[in-house]
Amino acid sequence: HYMLGDTSYPDDLGQSIPFDEFYARMAAGEMTKTSQVNVDEFLAYFEGFLKEGKDVLHVSLSSGLSGSVNSARIAAEELADKYPDNKVLVVDSLGASSGYGLLMDKLADLRDEGKSIEEVRDFAEANRLHLHHWFFSTDLTFYVRGGRISKAAGWFGTALKICPLLNMDDEGHLIPRQKIRGKKAVIQQIVKEMENHARGGHDYNGKCFISMSACMDDARAVADLVEEKFPHLNGKVMINNIGTTIGSHTGPGTVALFFWGDERTH
């Protein structure tokens, strides 16, 4: 869930508020905050599937960013006795945004290949740290507003056109890695990180997703460079919106790059 102004909304992929409107209202000064899904909501959601005789594999937003995975686990335990013939399995993605979207894309393929729910869960837990998440932001306003950097640092950073480059570590936390001066340089560097870490290097033949918050031109510039450097990609780079939960913290002006690679470190 997220708050925009004085109203609470579900994070429903832009259905309640279109993404462009959401980011425009943030840019105009409306405040945002987020809250995790509670146990009762998970109970109601999971039970809808269990009543139909279905098993559930729930893959959660990183525990390094949200406590929702704990609510999901409690709900799964509470339902186990009531529905002994079906199961709810919960996986901590240790990922976010289209990073764990890329994981879900692979898990759906495994399901469609006939793998059991346990086999799909085991793959997720064994491979989740091979999904790289790299982010940069061209607008420090919302990092200052959220208290992640000081007003002074934000002022100097903006004056010097500093773009922070972050990634997600092996515990699912977002970690600042570099401060890069200028948009062109940070676009080059984020693709350089893919060159350094992608499975197979320039021969990488997996999928690549990009997410962005109201900065399609920047996202397209990253995608074009990725497609130039990695000619064997599985299809074109897919560009999505950063959702409202993550976007509430980043604000507009953030681009995120996701791909399969070596194991993430601390």
Model-found features: residue ranges?
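A short glycine/small-residue-enriched secondary-structure motif
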Residues: 16-22, 46, 50-51, 78
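N-terminal glycine-rich anion-binding loop in soluble enzyme alpha/beta folds
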Residues: 1-41
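Short, flexible active-site-proximal loops enriched in glycine and acidic residues
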Residues: 54-58, 86-91
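Mixed-charge interfacial surface used for oligomerization/domain docking
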Residues: 1-9, 64-68, 72-77, 83, ...
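Short alpha-helical interface patches
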Residues: 20-27, 44-46, 184, 188-189
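Glycine-rich phosphate- or other oxyanion-binding loops that anchor nucleotides, phosphorylated ligands
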Residues: 27-63, 70, 74, 121
